[in-house]
Amino acid sequence: MHLATFTDGSIPPCCVGEPTSASMNNTIHIKDAWNNQELKDIRKALINDEPVFNCSQCYRDEQCGVNSHRKQSNDFYYRMYKDDIDRALDNVQDDGTMLIDPFTLDIRAGNTCNLKCIMCRPNESSKWFNDAKKILDVTGNDVVRRDWNNKININTQNFAWVEREEFWEDFKELVPTLKEIIFGGGEPFLSKSINNLIKYMVDTGHSSHIKIRFHTNGTTIPESFWELVDEFKEIELLFSIDGFDQQNYYVRNPAEWEPIVKNLYLADKTKANAMILFSVHSLSAYNIVDLYKWRMSQPFKRLNNIPIVLGRVYHPDYLNPQGLPQVVKDKIHTRIMNFIDEHKNNYPNGYFDSLEENANWIMDSSKDNLDALVDYIESLDKVRTTSFDETFPEYSEIINNARQ
């Protein structure tokens, strides 16, 4: 039922899975990729309830007692599309060939982006390449150097697939039977092809049966988009925000706060379902409370009714918050739990469940990566003339004390 791509055209089973060897760069048509041998083998394994290597991260989460992306998606999509999924299962041949087209797509359409978020790399953002070279010049840590030597080693031709007319023509052929599309990037609103496809779906009348979810940094949504929201069955906007104001500027550099807030309010006034997506990593975890407090202080009509969506950062290891020293993790956990205790009676039961689950997830043991993290922070500050100490004074003090 589902076909996903990463920015470089590689094809995973889903957005958090390990990529297969299949790629939009070595196939001409979407339907060829859809029944690639590796995807057929994955289908056979899943139908037979056999483990799949590409799903390893979710299996590890489940062993830690975490409600994994795999389980959440299985539950959610089966509730949403039970009849369609049952029909898809009836149309899988013994060799894994799927006889019907995908009806949900997750397309990360290239790496074109206007930001250079600290947990991204050139593969996810075209803006990262110059900073990546500079970090290699200033880092004094072998872990950071190895990490960025790997990240900077990309083939820019791997992003050419999003410029191929054949891909977007194939996409249009799927539109009549599509039910849901996820657009990420890069920054999807910078893609002319995506903007043209949105208009095509409206002009052909197919927008009425399609739900679209955008993963956006919220800085560059065109004014014309808001005029089309009502044309679709549903629009979801996941605003990737990792802190309040200057905190977000530091993490999602150089994201200005004013256009993000403006677009949050514009979304709140439409029928679009707007949510904030917060990436939980070593630099952001302590300050998620600040973003919650800011949002609570704002007179949003609908946005405050929806818990902040939390995404975990596992790689690189030095950005995985589980790799922080125990004393730092204790501080993070205490701050989050105190915040929940202070506010839980003002919100429905379950509103803070995900926040509490992530606070507990951080406490799980992992290798101490503080030296690499501190070197990465210092390297970023040198390259970008930013200041971690000034942006995160309280958290900076906690980290510095942990080093002594």
PLM segments and residue spans:
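Radical SAM enzyme [4Fe-4S]-AdoMet core and its adjacent flexible, acidic
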Residues: 1-28, 78, 108, 129, ...
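N-terminal pre-core extensions flanking Radical SAM catalytic domains
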Residues: 1-157, 174-175, 354-404
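Non-transmembrane alpha-helical segments in soluble domains
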Residues: 31, 56, 117, 172, ...
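A generic structured-segment signal
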Residues: 31-32, 42-44, 117, 121, ...
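Core AdoMet radical
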Residues: 102-112, 123-163, 176-193, 204-223, ...
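Extended amphipathic secondary-structure runs
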Residues: 163-200, 383-390, 403-404
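Leucine-rich repeat
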Residues: 169-174, 199-205, 228-230, 267
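Distinct, well-ordered alpha-helical segments
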Residues: 193-199, 223-229, 287-291
